Amino acid sequence: MSRYRGPRLKKIRRLGALLGLTRKTPKSGSNPKKKFHSGKKEQYRIRLQEKQKLRFHYGLTERQLLRYVYIAGKAKRSTGQVLLQLLEMRLDNILFRLGMASTIPGARQLVNHRHILVNGRIVNIPSFRCKPRDIITTKDNQRSKGLVQNSIASSDPGKLPKHLTIDTLEYKGLVNKILDRKWVGLKINELLVVEY
């Protein structure tokens, strides 16, 4: 299954707030289908919704998500927490968390168009797994700095997670450590995703 490129607000209305998907918010009371879906939710439906939240928030395909669940399952720690740590340490997500991109799809585009350097080397793979003490910068040209500057100016510095630091003057971010579960910005039950 390929990456979702359709209307994003429909997904937000169905699954709830997905901060990485878009900055737009749906109008209140604009979902006429909500009336018909009242009643008891089945276990399968709950698990499917949690999985879809994770997929659409991080912009993953079904195969990528299965691969991350497989890697997390091999770890000795809690599978759900390892899964979230793997997803949060992706380069596109770290750019979004630093405020260098307004959304995760925007961060993917920055990486794909070769505007981002990790430890002084160009990386054009959005799923690149960052490690502690990685330094993330932009290219020295004006175009790359301009793209990041707009996003940094509009981002809220109070929402920066504790495992990241950013230097807004030099457009440089640093990964300090691996993320704790409490700093994940998504309200999700990761155990239901693993069970699915």
From Swiss-Prot:
The keyword Cell wall biogenesis/degradation does not apply. GO terms for biological process: ribosomal small subunit biogenesis; translation. Residues 89-169 form the S4 RNA-binding domain. One of its GO terms (molecular function) is structural constituent of ribosome. Pfam families: Ribosomal_S4, S4. It comes from the Eukaryota. GO terms for cellular component: chloroplast; small ribosomal subunit. Residues 22-42 are annotated as: Disordered. It is found in: Plastid, Chloroplast. Keywords: Chloroplast, Plastid, Ribonucleoprotein, Ribosomal protein, RNA-binding, rRNA-binding. The keyword Chloroplast applies. Its main location: plastid. Part of the 30S ribosomal subunit. Contacts protein S5. The interaction surface between S4 and S5 is involved in control of translational fidelity. One of the primary rRNA binding proteins, it binds directly to 16S rRNA where it nucleates assembly of the body of the 30S subunit. Belongs to the universal ribosomal protein uS4 family. PANTHER family: 30S 40S RIBOSOMAL PROTEIN, SMALL RIBOSOMAL SUBUNIT PROTEIN US4M. This is Small ribosomal subunit protein uS4c.
